[in-house]
Amino acid sequence: MQRSIMSFFQPTKEGKAKKPEKETPSSIREKEPPPKVALKERNQVVPESDSPVKRTGRKVAQVLSCEGEDEDEAPGTPKVQKPVSDSEQSSPPSPDTCPENSPVFNCSSPMDISPSGFPKRRTARKQLPKRTIQDTLEEQNEDKTKTAKKRKKEEETPKESLAEAEDIKQKEEKEGDQLIVPSEPTKSPESVTLTKTENIPVCKAGVKLKPQEEEQSKPPARGAKTLSSFFTPRKPAVKTEVKQEESGTLRKEETKGTLDPANYNPSKNNYHPIEDACWKHGQKVPFLAVARTFEKIEEVSARLKMVETLSNLLRSVVALSPPDLLPVLYLSLNRLGPPQQGLELGVGDGVLLKAVAQATGRQLESIRAEVAEKGDVGLVAENSRSTQRLMLPPPPLTISGVFTKFCDIARLTGSASMAKKMDIIKGLFVACRHSEARYIARSLSGRLRLGLAEQSVLAALAQAVSLTPPGQEFPTVVVDAGKGKTAEARKMWLEEQGMILKQTFCEVPDLDRIIPVLLEHGLERLPEHCKLSPGVPLKPMLAHPTRGVSEVLKRFEEVDFTCEYKYDGQRAQIHVLEGGEVKIFSRNQEDNTGKYPDIISRIPKIKHPSVTSFILDTEAVAWDREKKQIQPFQVLTTRKRKEVDASEIQVQVCLYAFDLIYLNGESLVRQPLSRRRQLLRENFVETEGEFVFTTSLDTKDTEQIAEFLEQSVKDSCEGLMVKTLDVDATYEIAKRSHNWLKLKKDYLDGVGDTLDLVVIGAYLGRGKRAGRYGGFLLAAYDEESEELQAICKLGTGFSDEELEEHHQSLQALVLPTPRPYVRIDGAVAPDHWLDPSIVWEVKCADLSLSPIYPAARGLVDKEKGISLRFPRFIRVRKDKQPEQATTSNQVASLYRKQSQIQNQQSSDLDSDVEDY
């Protein structure tokens, strides 16, 4: 009959006996069956093929003949005892090497190996003197009984205190039948509490030890550490003390960059750029730190607080990770480089929403509905990302990594570029944490919606490098250079430092050139190393509008001025470098060199041989060579914009030069206009139809100015530019100055200027305009909120042909819902929403407060916006982007100026906020 494997481990029937009703301890020792599991099996020794009876007999024989060896049947004992350390278990002593009747704990390792080369097992029982088989059985049974009682007690009170465990130990030691062996604690749940005590009973012996042997058997003192420190675990109590000591000693050393980026707060008072940073010196700036900064900026509306918050982040970047300063600045400006590089993300809302849907596992329609409800694709992306959990999250995003990915997206071209862009965007969203997805989505859409204008970012940068000067060796010594100054002195000092950076940026509006110099030489020496030079486009000087000749005379009453034709064309800034290379830039610093190959070919013959380098400010105007007259602006817009072949040019252009900014290595921006004009005419030569000086008139006579204005209109010009010649006549880069005034024919009966507005919607026509658009909803651009705010409904100024043309061209821009950044408030919703990408020039009779339209709301009146009265379409501005449209601040300024003139308060004109 075949037997099961378990039957070999069951006690024989002869060994079993019925227990009496009352048993004595001795009877328990005599009658209790042997254990069910052998120690060999617990030690992973393969059972031999002998029967259980033979194996039991052999074990008994070994007990009688082996020194200090106990029986193997004690299943309960290992759960209570502390096992011997790993080093001792791996090298058990040979019975021949240990002296008789001596409980030795450590035997020489060479003798621990059997002749066959296998290590011998070793237990605590092998250290005991020889015993008889009867004593062994009695001790084993008694040990099992006590162990069972102790285990039961431990299960009832698993969290026994240290003192109670010590009492148990002392009580058992007094009985004289206990040998304590310090060893590694077991991992069984029952022994968790006991491992907290230092000396717990392990095994019992039936032999009384001599006094010397008892001393040897006592556990070593707590501080002695006789066992190997590598294999012996530290006691939990000691470990806790060590942790506390270590944390106390390292706390001061690890205060730099120890915060979680999710808790980073750059808006805190008394910010320390090193101790309050969330990364350490030499590490890359976490993108989450930038996102947290944007969050704090978004929470406040005060400009000074916004500048301070961004400045604190920049201080930490300067002190800890200077190479990341440039990416942080570009992402704060929502740019990828200087304008002349032409790097744009080119990610539409459709692609962005698809990427969010695929990265988060949500349905596209659900995301679109949520965007329509919340009006912010960034918040939708953040909420979608926060609901997804990943088993293996990607590494955290860094500012340099995100910036590099954005640049990769901008450089991708070709038929497969959209799929590649989608993959990059999805990868970014998958790696996002917390609010990172919000600002990734907003950056990709082109609108951060922080209210951080360029001047605010420059102010924050100037403040950062002033308080925490760059170039210091770490650890940074000066973290707050303004410490010790009074509040007023500190404010004035920071303003002076800010002016240094702003003036330098006006002449060199290229952070790629400014930041390396700033980090190496500091802000004070920045003007020495960053100077105006050909090849870097400048922001042009702009003019303020006026409403009549009388206003011009009042402003320039005591100074000499000149009147120049205002040509209707495109601003062209001509740069010629020392090596002869020619660059042509637009008013927005875009590189238009490829658009004008015909102009490049003319450069050698329009300058004198002595001229080696220069920067000219000109107007490129469409020119009819046959009729020798200026053509309308609309003709110029039909010219191809990129990669133009000179042989295919149909629309010819003529350059009208009106200013000289740089000549032969010398900047002329601080020279008066009279000197600049003189140098222009001395060093350049006119060529009819190709290069001509602007027509001008120097006079103070009212009648002459009026006649000159009429003549400019007859010569196909917009009007006049009136400029001071000597007093306050420097070239003010990137500034709309009162020293240059615009005087147009239309201004005499209007508000003083036309407005460039964005088309955001269209109304279906009725009557004779049925079947096409009859009206349009226009909006101004608000720089702070980065919104397009509705300002008026436009329906006049169009010919039938223009209406048909607009209807056809705008069909491709129809949207089911408005863009999130479009705000109309109480205005009548259009029949068709349009993608806000078209800019129109509009003229109006007047401006008025409006409870319906949101444009400039809060700037003039707390509750009302501003609208146009009798608006009229003038032309399409193909040279302008929506962000370059008339701003809400400009609308408010036009309204105030109109009110001042009506109330004859022209003296207050100087209070207008200038764009500096």
From Swiss-Prot:
Sites of the modification N6-acetyllysine?
Answer: K144, K225
Q: Which InterPro entries match?
A: ATP-dep_DNA_ligase (IPR050191), DNA_ligase_ATP-dep (IPR000977), DNA_ligase_ATP-dep_C (IPR012309), DNA_ligase_ATP-dep_cent (IPR012310), DNA_ligase_ATP-dep_CS (IPR016059), DNA_ligase_ATP-dep_N (IPR012308), DNA_ligase_N_sf (IPR036599), NA-bd_OB-fold (IPR012340)
Gene3D superfamilies in alphabetical order: 3.30.1490.70, DNA ligase, ATP-dependent, N-terminal domain (1.10.3260.10), DNA ligase/mRNA capping enzyme (3.30.470.30), Nucleic acid-binding proteins (2.40.50.140)
**Cofactor(s) required for function per UniProt:** Mg(2+)
Question: Keyword DNA-binding on this protein?
Answer: no
Which chemical reaction does it catalyze? ATP + (deoxyribonucleotide)n-3'-hydroxyl + 5'-phospho-(deoxyribonucleotide)m = (deoxyribonucleotide)n+m + AMP + diphosphate
Alphabetized GO MF terms: ATP binding; DNA binding; DNA ligase (ATP) activity; metal ion binding
Location relative to the cell: Nucleus
- Keywords noted in UniProt: Acetylation, ATP-binding, Cell cycle, Cell division, DNA damage, DNA recombination, DNA repair, DNA replication, Ligase, Magnesium, Metal-binding, Nucleotide-binding, Nucleus, Phosphoprotein
Record's compositionally biased regions (Basic residues): 119-129
The GO cellular component terms are: nucleus
Which class of enzymes does this protein belong to?
Answer: ligase
Look up the EC number in the record and give it.
6.5.1.1
Q: Which PANTHER family match?
A: DNA LIGASE 1 (PTHR45674:SF4), DNA LIGASE 1/3 FAMILY MEMBER (PTHR45674)
Q: What is this protein called?
A: DNA ligase 1
**Source species, please?**
Mus musculus
Q: Identify the taxonomic lineage of the organism of origin.
A: Eukaryota, Metazoa, Chordata, Craniata, Vertebrata
What gene name is given for the protein in this entry?
Answer: Lig1
